[in-house]
Amino acid sequence: MTEQYQHRARKRFGQNFLHDAGVIDKILRAIRAKPEDRLLEIGPGQGALTEGLLNSGAQLDVVELDKDLIPILTGQFGNKPNFNLHQGDALKFDFNSLGAEPRSLRVVGNLPYNISTPLIFHLLQNASLIRDMHFMLQKEVVERMAAGPGGGDWGRLSIMVQYHCRVEHLFNVGPGAFNPPPKVDSAIVRLVPYETLPHPAKDHRVLERVVREAFNQRRKTLRNTLKLLLSSDEITASGVDGSLRPEQLDLAAFVRLADTLSEKVVTE
């Protein structure tokens, strides 16, 4: 990067700029962007991935919060006909404003670790617009996303992401690939929203509520954590053992509990 475009990473934005050419190339090869694609990059930073994405010929919208990076990105890529820059907070961004067709958006990002989980949940609310997502995240977060029942990593994030998406932990990235180096390892994850949900809930908001309540006290039994929502008999009627802890249940079991609660709310 030339001196004209130098920018110091800001801690309050959780900025760690990717600079390792080998890692950048590996990410771009995992994405395999094509000219007919509609790409959305969240947090382009200094444009480490942006140039390669633009070179694919695909239409690229980028969302960047840091106002100081806007002239840098405009200076580097503003003359590209397939580049469209949005200054703002991705957590508040209206993805419908892009006018994308259903299941057409390919979302990419080296996400700031301090907002990665809420941003993932925001994106899941727009899953019907998204074809796939490729993110650089804290390795621990990716492990939680990809986790299965029975372990300590299985929780609210695992369940809600896997409700909407197929999860692939692609590869890990060490701190040295960034400037400044983060204090944790990173990983690349691919999320592919399902065309047809394998375990559809009657109301996904009720599922979110049940999962949140269950894992608020994850060491307690379901009979205790869900007592304000469901009785012991209602848990049993859902085909679930109320003496189990939440981490012992799979996604399908949580959907059954949520559907029981949905029916209860309707009848009441």
From Swiss-Prot:
InterPro entries: KsgA/Erm, rRNA_Ade_diMease-like_C, rRNA_Ade_Mease_Trfase_CS, rRNA_Ade_methylase_Trfase_N, rRNA_adenine_dimethylase, SAM-dependent_MTases_sf. Pfam families: RrnaAD (PF00398). PROSITE patterns: RRNA_A_DIMETH, SAM_RNA_A_N6_MT. It catalyses: adenosine(1518)/adenosine(1519) in 16S rRNA + 4 S-adenosyl-L-methionine = N(6)-dimethyladenosine(1518)/N(6)-dimethyladenosine(1519) in 16S rRNA + 4 S-adenosyl-L-homocysteine + 4 H(+). Its EC number is 2.1.1.182. GO terms for cellular component: cytosol. GO terms for molecular function: 16S rRNA (adenine(1518)-N(6)/adenine(1519)-N(6))-dimethyltransferase activity; RNA binding. SMART domains: rADc. S-adenosyl-L-methionine binds at residues 16, 18, 43, 64, 89, 110. Coiled coil: none annotated. It is found in: Cytoplasm. Specifically dimethylates two adjacent adenosines (A1518 and A1519) in the loop of a conserved hairpin near the 3'-end of 16S rRNA in the 30S particle. May play a critical role in biogenesis of 30S subunits. Belongs to the class I-like SAM-binding methyltransferase superfamily. rRNA adenine N(6)-methyltransferase family. RsmA subfamily. This is Ribosomal RNA small subunit methyltransferase A. It comes from Pseudomonas savastanoi pv. phaseolicola (strain 1448A / Race 6) (Pseudomonas syringae pv. phaseolicola (strain 1448A / Race 6)).
